[in-house]
Amino acid sequence: IEDHVFHPNYPSQLVWNYVGKDANGNPYPNPTIHARYGRPVVLRLYNDLPEDHTGFGTPEISLHLHNLHTPSESDGFPGDYFSKTKSGPTMSRPGEFKDQFYPNIYAGLDEFPRSASNPAGGDRREALGTLWYHDRCLDFTAANATRGMAGFYLIYDALDSGNENDPNSSALRLPSGAYDYPLAFQDKRFDSNGIQVFDQLDPEGTLGDKITVNGKIEPVLRVARRKYRLRLLNAGPSRYYEFYFVNNANGLQTFTYIANDGNLLPAPLINR
């Protein structure tokens, strides 16, 4: 739970986040997780959401890592939700935390077993680089994710290594570090007092009238005169987007399109 300001003209309000800790032990909301193929990750998720909350969403949670190949017990099925007092139909009992195991393997492990040249195993053509994690509680996936429970999970390998100065000549050497920028887009609705609202009973879905990027309404990113890697994620429940880069005169700018739905394309496409 965090006090959050979506825009300077809007009041501070409570949102629900996953909270990690940096190297100094400081809390960090919805941390971007950096992983590598062949290096498993065990993530322990504590649920400290209040049972007597106000507003939309539910304090029962089920963490789902979207699109990665994971064991079924760590997939975050909708029925795997839990809290200190409740548990879903596919959980044995309530609890304070749940461990998630992410082996970080490629698809096709049976067809392409581990070897000296492929220590992670699987089909490296199936590598996924840009993933995200979010809540997937039964009947409340959209509400809980919209309330703030979503973040990035970036996974690297020898080709997409996360190092633009990689000495490996076969690496793509894409922009990295501060120049590799994940951007999560969510459309949201706010009432006349500037408080976020969500109609979780509308079967047709909810379209927001404000677009947030990484939790801020229409933020500005100051950039250097160099190449950037932008990872664009639609983290909202209903809206579709068409993205364009324009200059101050509203003229279209070119960019290189390198991935879709988490996968690198066979070859980059130049937007003209």
Residue ranges and their predicted role:
Residues 38, 46-50, 233-238:
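Short solvent-exposed strand-capping/beta-turn motif centered on an Asx-Ser/Thr pair
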Residues 8-10, 44, 51-62, 147, ...:
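Short, hydrophobic/aromatic beta-strand segments
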Residues 13-33, 209-219:
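N-terminal edge beta-strand
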